């Protein structure tokens, strides 16, 4: 995306990425088939896919029971729905904050704009670290297979462990005084923890609800996560403007920027100070603190 934006502008970056999405949608529409009719799925693979269904059928003396669907509004009467939705509300926004604001963070705090080689390298390393999230599928399986825990308890224990890793975000700003590598690595670890957490959170739906309700509960959780993401990203932008202070430009109060400051502009409202950080750095520290504790709150 930075390469496209630097060469053809940010508008073209949106268009190109969006077009790729439509191409992928075309593959999905024309190539996807249900496993039992897909020509490339052999019997062994089909049996593996259907192993849970086969086991359930045998457990019910080979009599399939038609599950009753849960109406949308009825789903809100279950505590489990609110538990899942709250977990999504608290944590989805953290991922989107890191995704959207990390390039701006590197630019605001370290002067590394997205078109520089170092910024691209840092972003690449960050997302490479996020790939560690594959552990998210292994750990609960270990608890279930090796320790004999039931699937739900195993997933919840794994999620609790993953919820502690984002606490490293509390150190992103303090260690960032030494090198920009520290916050980048920490954000990468927090991102990996989020994806591991999120994968297990989605899996808990199947533990708490029948198959007929999974789509409904997933949709409710997605809605809650979207609301949380909107709040944290919109709120972060407002906080960063507020923490930067203001200056008077042509008789109008404007957010103080590095460019205004370099041109000799004077502060109308002084920048925020918080725990030794000043200006937009203080704003980022506050948001990092929120992101750090969000998973433990969501787990509870």
Q: What residue ranges belong to the model's regions?
A:
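Helix-loop-helix hairpin linking two adjacent transmembrane segments in secondary transporters
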Residues: 1-39
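Juxtamembrane intracellular "pre-TM" segments in multi-pass secondary transporters
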Residues: 35-85, 109-112
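Extracytoplasmic gate region of multi-pass secondary transporters
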Residues: 73-138, 190, 194-202, 206, ...
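Loop-to-transmembrane helix entry/capping segments in MFS-fold secondary transporters
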Residues: 114-116, 211-220
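Paired intracellular helix-loop junctions of major facilitator superfamily
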Residues: 144-146, 205-214
């Amino acid at each position: 995306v930075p390469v496209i934006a630097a060469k053809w502008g940010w508008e073209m970056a949106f268009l190109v990425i969006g077009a790729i999405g439509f191409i992928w949608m075309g593959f999905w529409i024309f190539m996807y088939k249900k496993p039992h009719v897909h020509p490339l799925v052999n019997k062994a693979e089909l049996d593996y896919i259907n192993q849970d269904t086969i086991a359930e059928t045998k457990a019910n003396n080979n009599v399939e029971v038609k599950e009753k669907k849960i109406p949308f509004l009825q789903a809100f009467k279950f505590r489990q729905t609110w538990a899942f939705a709250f977990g999504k509300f608290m944590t989805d926004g953290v991922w989107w904050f890191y995704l959207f604001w990390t390039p701006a963070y590197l630019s605001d705090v370290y002067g590394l704009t997205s078109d520089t080689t170092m910024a691209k390298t840092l972003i690449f390393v960050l997302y490479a670290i996020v790939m560690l999230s594959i552990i998210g599928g292994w750990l609960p399986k270990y608890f279930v297979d090796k320790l004999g825990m039931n699937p739900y308890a195993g997933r919840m224990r794994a999620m609790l462990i993953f919820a502690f890793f984002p606490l490293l975000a509390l150190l992103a700003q303090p260690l960032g005084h030494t090198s920009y590598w520290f916050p980048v690595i920490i954000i990468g670890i927090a991102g990996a923890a989020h994806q591991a957490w999120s994968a297990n959170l989605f899996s808990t739906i199947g533990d708490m609800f029948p198959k007929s309700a999974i789509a409904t509960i997933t949709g409710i959780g997605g809605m809650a996560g979207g609301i949380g993401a909107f709040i944290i990203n919109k709120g972060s932008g407002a906080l960063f403007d507020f923490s930067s202070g203001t200056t008077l430009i042509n008789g109008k109060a404007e957010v103080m920027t590095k460019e205004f400051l370099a041109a000799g502009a004077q502060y109308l409202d002084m920048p925020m100070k918080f725990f030794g950080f000043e200006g937009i750095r203080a704003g980022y520290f506050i948001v990092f603190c929120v992101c750090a504790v969000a998973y433990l709150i969501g787990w509870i």
